[in-house]
């Protein structure tokens, strides 16, 4: 693609969240430029991320706010991300290949962990080493590490919060209840409390957020053709209600897909705002999918009847083992009595 003229030649499958056209029409080409810049920009952290400025400064990147400026940043590390295997080669003559850039196999920077997780002011020479941390979304401090050839995400917490305990406990509770959830374990990195979770993407497993999918596709149509995905959606609404998760926006529930691009519902993730919901808390996914504004409890009661959950062991759980056990117990009982 030519970012100046908008000319595009499509040689293979594109990301779900990128739409461009092979066209000589002026408006189509303007749209191509806008869309590719938006896609590139989506692979750059937001400035509200804790230590975002330290991360950008370490790589000598500008503190960009516009899609144009973010695109210039993303292109410096070829738009690499651990979300998928898409990347950008700037020129045909450029001496780079997927083999030389593949984040799933290459080394990570120990310095980036100190910058991304603790805000230590350091400098990074190889911008590709910053790609995993520069492209990770969310506000909480986080950093990628490699242990025994496995990738893990360390996720800290904002000052004064209890996010690490909340995320680890919500994950443990939901797994005990039988939900398909990312495992977050409490750990300590250089004296800093954090959760640790294994990377769930790979060279053959990509992710697309619901927000990204809905940029170009109709999610209700997807649910009609794949009812098993809608059932998983209902399970998510129940899970978020049970642990009082207030941060389930359309950017942090996901679909996974392999090389065949067959979509499946991703494991539930991101629980650092668990146990914060109150009676009036709204369910944002319902609003995104069904265009209805309902409370988290109303959505859960509706979804509970459609989720196909095995609740046989729910009443036998010893809630005293959990710091937030009583909170969840009350919500479990309300659903079981519905």
Predicted stretch roles:
Residues 251-253:
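Conserved protein-kinase catalytic-loop position immediately C-terminal to the HRD catalytic Asp
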């Amino acid at each position: 693609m030519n970012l100046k003229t908008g000319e595009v030649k499509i040689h293979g499958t594109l990301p779900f969240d990128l739409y461009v056209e092979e066209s000589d029409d002026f408006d189509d080409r303007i749209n191509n430029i806008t869309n590719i810049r938006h896609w590139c920009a989506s692979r750059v952290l937001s400035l509200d991320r804790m230590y975002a400025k330290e991360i950008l400064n370490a790589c000598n990147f500008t503190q960009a706010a516009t899609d144009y400026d973010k695109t210039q940043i993303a292109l410096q590390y070829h738009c690499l991300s651990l979300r998928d295997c898409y990347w950008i080669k700037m020129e045909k003559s450029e001496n780079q290949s997927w083999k030389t850039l593949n984040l799933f196999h290459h080394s990570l920077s120990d310095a980036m962990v100190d910058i991304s997780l603790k805000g230590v002011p350091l400098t990074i020479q190889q911008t590709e080493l910053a790609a995993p941390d520069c492209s990770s979304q969310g506000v909480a401090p986080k950093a990628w590490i490699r242990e025994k050839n496995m990738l893990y995400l360390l996720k800290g917490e904002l000052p004064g919060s209890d996010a690490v305990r909340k995320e680890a406990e919500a994950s443990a509770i939901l797994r005990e209840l039988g939900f398909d959830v990312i495992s977050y374990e409490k750990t300590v990195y250089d004296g800093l409390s954090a959760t640790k979770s294994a990377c769930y993407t790979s060279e053959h497993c990509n992710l697309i957020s619901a927000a990204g999918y809905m940029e170009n596709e109709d999610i209700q149509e997807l649910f009609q053709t794949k009812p098993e995905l809608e059932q998983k959606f209902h399970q998510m609404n129940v899970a978020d209600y049970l642990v009082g998760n207030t941060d389930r926006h359309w950017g942090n529930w996901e679909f996974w897909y392999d090389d065949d691009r067959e979509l499946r519902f991703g494991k539930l993730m991101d629980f650092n705002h668990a146990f914060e919901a109150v009676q009036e808390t709204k369910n944002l996914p319902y609003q995104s999918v069904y265009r209805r504004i309902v409370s988290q409890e109303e959505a859960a009661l509706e979804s509970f009847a459609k989720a196909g959950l095995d609740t046989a062991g729910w009443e036998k759980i010893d809630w005293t083992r959990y710091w937030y056990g009583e909170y969840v117990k009350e919500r479990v009982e309300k659903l079981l009595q519905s």
